Every structure is written in C-alpha cells, then in structure tokens.
C-alpha cells in the first residue's frame, strides 16, 4: 500500500509582544476555528502561525498512523516527497517557511542580507546571525496591511527635509544639500547621497535623537490639538510609532521609506537588502527558511549600524512599484500565482465560489503546504486512507506529485493559500 503523502498539520503559534491580542488576532481566530480544544487568552498576543519545519516551530502531524511526530522528521525520512529538483537543490530540506502574521504594534525596521553576506555575517557573529542563508520574503494582505518598504523617491525625502526641521537637523546640512543636488544628477550620485543621509541619521547620538524627536512630537501634538491636519509630514504615524517606541531612531525612518497600505490580496516582495517594517494588519507571509535580520530601529534589540548602512539597497522608487501583482493561472480560473524572482518559494491563492461543489488541487513537482482561510472542505487523495475534513484555519501538507480533490461541504466561498517551490 502506498505511503501516506497527504496529511493535516497542527502548527506552532508564536506569541511575540507585537502581535494582536486574543480574538482580535487572525492567527488566534484561525487557531480557534481549526482546533476545538484551543483556548484563546484575550490578554495574550497571537503574533505568528508557523507552517513548516523550522526547528523553532516544526509542525506536528495530525495522523496517528504516521510514525513520525513532526513534519521535519517526516521529510527527513521521506525526502522524495519534496520533489526531485527541490530535494537536490535544497539538500533534502523544505526550503520555505509559511506564516500568518497578526501585527498590532510595529515590527523593527530591518533588512535581510543576501546569501554571500549572510555567510560572512554568520561566520563573524553567529550570536546575531544564526544561519548562513538569505531571507527573501513576501507578504500578502488578509486585511488592510500597513508597512514601510524601500526608499522613497528622492523628491519626497527632500520635501520632508524642508518641512521637518528636526529631521534635517539629524541629517546635517551638508548631507541634505548633497541629496538636493543629486536630483539633477545620475543614479550613482543619488545612491551615494541617499547612503550619506541615511548613515548620518543612523549614526546620530542617542541623546540628540531623543531631543529632536521630543521637539517634533510636541509640535505635531500641538498642531493636532488645534485641529490641524499633519498628514503632509505623516503626523499620525509618527505619534503612533513614538508611543510604541519612545525616543527610537526608527521614528525618523518614516521620512526615508515608502508607506504602503496593501488591500486584501495585494502583496509586497522584499528582496535582500531592502529596508522594511510591518506596521499593522494581518497577512500571509512566505520566506526562505532563515532567521537572519539586520535591524535599523523600532526595536530594543541589537542594531548593527555599520553592517546595515553598508548593505542596504539605496534605490529610490515610488510606493506603487513595491507592489507585487500575482499572475492568473491559464489552466485554473480560481488560481492566482505570486511567483517572486527567487527559487525558494512561490505562493498560490485559490478563490473558489460557494456555488462550486468540487475543486481539484493540482499536483506539483514540489512539496506544498495548504492553508484554508475561509470555507469548509473535505480533502481526499489517492494515498490518504480516509477523507480529511478541513475548515477555516486547517493546514494540509501535500507531497510532491500528489493531487488532492476537495469537496466544498458548505456553500460558502473558499479562500486558500498554498506555499510551494517551483524550480
């Protein structure tokens, strides 16, 4: 009899302090829906759901006929289930980590090193850089999702330098003048000027940052109290971040970085060396399996300023250029594919109207993980010994080259996301 290669998973929840509290969190709601025994504490944060084999959150297999207890153990014993190319390319390991995030307070402004730099940093400082892999990542909004991503067009930064004297003070007159001059120069001059400005900010003395930030917060608060709109200098966002991280250098980074609000289904892709921060909302996220982060602010953690200023990609672009649109599948009218320019992962979104009663999940030459966000189905496959019921929050592992038939058991629209590796 064929070994079972399709089975449900119980996934690990991370309760980081920045997560949404209790049942306000999409992570908690997915957990409560999929596990009738789950008890949600309204006074605890539910930040991330991890779907994968990462040692800090290896998914448990919900099928007692399978001897291995976790997905990581099972894949180690069944490497062919990864798909032949994936197995060879990624040394018999699942190359991606799939997540749901529920963000209440801002995550640190950060960037992830490319493969070459990751290897170097890991050798030099393994306590800060725990592995030698790169960490490209993609976020797809489930609810309106706010984030900072990549450097703004220089014109916008120059406008902020004029309108926010506290920002100009920290950058310094020379670096600010260099940035203004670069507007009429080539891209190399822009990159150099932007690096100089950002480095000046990041290397500012803590005492001076706190003084200037307090001046700015006081000024914005007084204007808001007088009924004035301060959106031209991102007043509301600055006050929000200052309340969350008082005196933090990262509060000024909003004048360098694009502010994006993704609508549900919209995505942003964060390649190596792009500065970014998630601010608020719920999303599905997929990334290469790595834990390397170089932080720049909005954090009490270690900030490696020299590495950060050296590694960043100082390429300004308008915020709409940071959006990563999916492609519609030519074979399947219900399928959208988010396929970023890295080999480690691809995410598929499946939206099936409630009027449809059956849906076939295509076989791929890659292991994949399927998450049900809305809807109720029963899954069956040639190797599964019995039908597998899945409702909102349910997670299914699908081995390479396995097809799965889904029966929609409730006439409601079905929304699912599937992470895989298309080489």
Swiss-Prot record:
Q: Which domain of life is it from?
A: Eukaryota
What are the names of the required cofactors? Answer: Zn(2+)
Modified-residue entries (Phosphoserine), positions: 102, 108
Which E.C. number(s) belong to this protein? 5.3.1.8
- Please list the residues that carry the modification N-acetylalanine: 2
Annotated cofactor note: Binds 1 zinc ion per subunit.
* A Gene Ontology term for the protein's cellular component: cytosol
This protein's name: Mannose-6-phosphate isomerase
What gene does the UniProt entry assign to this protein? MPI
């Amino acid at each position: 009899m064929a070994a079972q290669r399709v089975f449900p998973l119980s996934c690990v929840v991370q309760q980081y302090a920045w997560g949404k509290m209790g049942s306000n969190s999409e992570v908690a709601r997915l957990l409560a829906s999929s596990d009738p025994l789950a008890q949600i504490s309204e006074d605890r944060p539910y930040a991330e759901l991890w779907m994968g084999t990462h040692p800090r959150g290896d998914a448990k297999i919900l099928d007692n006929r399978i001897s291995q207890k976790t997905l990581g153990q099972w894949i180690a014993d069944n490497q062919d289930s990864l798909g032949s190319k994936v197995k060879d390319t990624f040394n018999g390991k699942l190359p991606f980590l799939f997540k749901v995030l529920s963000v209440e307070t801002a995550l640190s402004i950060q960037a992830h090193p490319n493969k070459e730099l990751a290897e170097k940093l890991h050798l030099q400082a393994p306590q800060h850089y725990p592995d030698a892999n790169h960490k490209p990542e993609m976020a797809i909004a489930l609810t309106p999702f706010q984030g900072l991503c990549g450097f703004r067009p220089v014109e916008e930064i120059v406008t902020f330098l004029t309108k926010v004297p506290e920002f100009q003070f920290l950058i310094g007159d020379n670096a600010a003048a260099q940035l203004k001059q670069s507007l009429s120069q080539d891209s190399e001059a822009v990159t150099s000027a932007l690096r100089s400005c950002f480095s000046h900010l990041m290397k500012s003395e803590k005492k001076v940052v706190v003084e200037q930030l307090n001046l700015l917060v006081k000024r914005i608060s007084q204007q808001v109290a007088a009924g004035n709109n301060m959106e031209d200098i991102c007043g509301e966002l600055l006050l929000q971040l200052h309340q969350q991280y008082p005196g933090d250098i990262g509060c000024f980074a909003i004048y360098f970085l694009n502010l994006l609000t993704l609508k549900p289904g919209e995505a942003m892709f964060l390649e190596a060396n792009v500065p970014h921060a998630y601010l608020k909302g719920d999303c599905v996220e997929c990334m290469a399996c790595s834990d390397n982060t170089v932080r720049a602010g909005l954090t009490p953690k270690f900030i490696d300023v020299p590495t950060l200023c050296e590694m960043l990609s100082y390429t300004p672009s308008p915020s709409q250029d940071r959006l990563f649109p999916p492609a519609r599948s030519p074979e399947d009218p219900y399928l959208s594919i988010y396929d970023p320019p890295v080999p480690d992962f691809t995410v598929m979104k499946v939206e099936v109207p409630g009027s449809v009663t059956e849906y076939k999940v295509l076989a791929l030459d890659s292991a994949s993980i399927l998450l049900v966000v809305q809807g109720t189905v029963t899954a069956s496959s040639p190797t599964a010994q019995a039908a597998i019921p899945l409702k909102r929050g349910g997670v299914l592992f699908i081995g390479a080259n396995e097809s799965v038939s889904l029966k929609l058991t409730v006439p409601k629209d079905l929304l699912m996301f599937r992470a895989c590796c298309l080489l």
